[in-house]
UniProtKB/Swiss-Prot annotation:
Gene Ontology cellular component annotations, sorted alphabetically: cytosolic small ribosomal subunit
HAMAP family for the chain: Ribosomal_uS3_B
Gene3D superfamilies according to UniProt: 3.30.300.20, Ribosomal protein S3, C-terminal domain (3.30.1140.32)
Record-linked CDD domains: KH-II_30S_S3 (cd02412)
Quaternary assembly: Part of the 30S ribosomal subunit. Forms a tight complex with proteins S10 and S14.
Function: Binds the lower part of the 30S subunit head. Binds mRNA in the 70S ribosome, positioning it for translation.
Keywords of the record: Ribonucleoprotein, Ribosomal protein, RNA-binding, rRNA-binding
Protein name in the entry: Small ribosomal subunit protein uS3
Domain KH type-2, first and last residues per copy: 39-111
Family the UniProt entry places it in: Belongs to the universal ribosomal protein uS3 family.
An MF annotation (GO) of this entry: structural constituent of ribosome
UniProt record, GO biological process: translation
């Protein structure tokens, strides 16, 4: 059944962690889930050009005040930060208006976007919308991903390929992508491309390697220094943050 299920959801709690990290009683859970949905929808809709890979939301309480911390993993941090962090301050105020809570932002720049499945899928979708040939799009994407040193990559595009009336699917596989092995660090992403021939579905699987007992994904993937800005209501910057993607 590993072929049919979402590889990200199948590995949650085993080698992967949740994007929303908080605890709440049953009365507040629906409210928090709705707030998380609104936050992610707002950021993805208004700042898609920044190539957003992941939005992590953490909640805490300090002196009867609810605080939301958002870790934003992006490929183009300049679009989010803007000049003198003006864009970041604007996003913070807008999300505070939506949630009515104090919001802290941590922008984490991804050093190698070709290694992240969702960014590869978004790039492929953008090329399809620019009328690139679907086979060329997949081969170019696979070549770039393999240069990063991953163990395997798989792509699949579905829709009216080549403008034909009958929809079909076509994909490529290079290396090894073990979907049934739970310790395998398989990253999966899906997005859509809207073209003159209709909507195309784009799927990408990237195999980073096996996660051994006692290790996590962060241990197996090589860490690197990144730039980040941490902005609150008081517009204070935190120390440089080091993360991994």
């Amino acid at each position: 059944m590993g072929q049919k299920s979402n590889p990200n959801g199948l590995r949650l709690g085993i080698i992967k962690n949740w994007d929303s990290k908080w605890f709440a009683n049953f009365k507040k859970t629906p409210q928090f889930i709705h707030e998380d949905f609104c936050i992610r929808n707002f950021i993805n809709k208004n700042y898609s050009k920044a190539l957003i890979a992941q939005i992590e939301i953490e909640r805490s309480k300090k002196k009867d005040k609810e605080i939301i911390k958002i870790n934003l993993h992006v490929a183009k941090s300049n679009i989010i930060n803007g000049k003198d962090n003006e864009s970041l301050k604007k996003i913070t105020k807008q999300i505070e208006q939506i949630t009515k809570k104090e919001v802290f932002f941590n922008v984490i720049e991804i050093k190698n976007p070709d290694k992240v499945a969702i960014l590869v899928a978004k790039t492929m979708a953008e090329q399809l919308e620019q009328r690139f040939y679907f086979r060329r799009v997949q081969k170019m994407a696979i070549q770039k991903v393999l240069k990063t040193g991953v163990k395997g990559v798989k792509t699949l595009i579905s829709g009216r390929l080549g403008g034909l009336e009958m929809a079909r699917s076509e994909g490529y596989l290079e290396g090894r992508v073990p979907l049934n092995t739970l310790r395998a660090d398989v990253e999966y992403a899906f997005t859509e491309a809207h073209t003159t021939y209709g909507s195309f579905g784009v799927k990408v699987w990237i195999f980073h390697g096996d996660v051994l007992p006692g290790e996590t994904i962060l241990d197996t993937r090589k860490p690197f220094a990144i730039k980040s800005n941490y902005i609150s209501k008081n517009n204070k910057k935190s120390n440089n943050y080091k993360g991994d993607k």
